[in-house]
Amino acid sequence: MITILQIQKQLIEAIKTSGLKQTEIAKKIGVSQQTISHYIKGDKMPSLDTLANLCVVLDIDPADILCIHNSK
């Protein structure tokens, strides 16, 4: 089962790796910087469409954010 804490950790890592500031990310996906801060703190979860946009902006596979890995 995926937890908010797992998604939060993956999101924090993706933001660090991207080198983008919260304000830049917020502008690109059409939310406030405070909203990005809430996602990072785990106070709020992004909607599915916002999460998809975050993945595009952060250049990360949604499966990584959602901690979904195929083991074949």
Model regions and ranges:
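Residue-level signal for the short linker/turn that defines the boundary of a DNA-recognition helix
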Residues: 20, 46-49
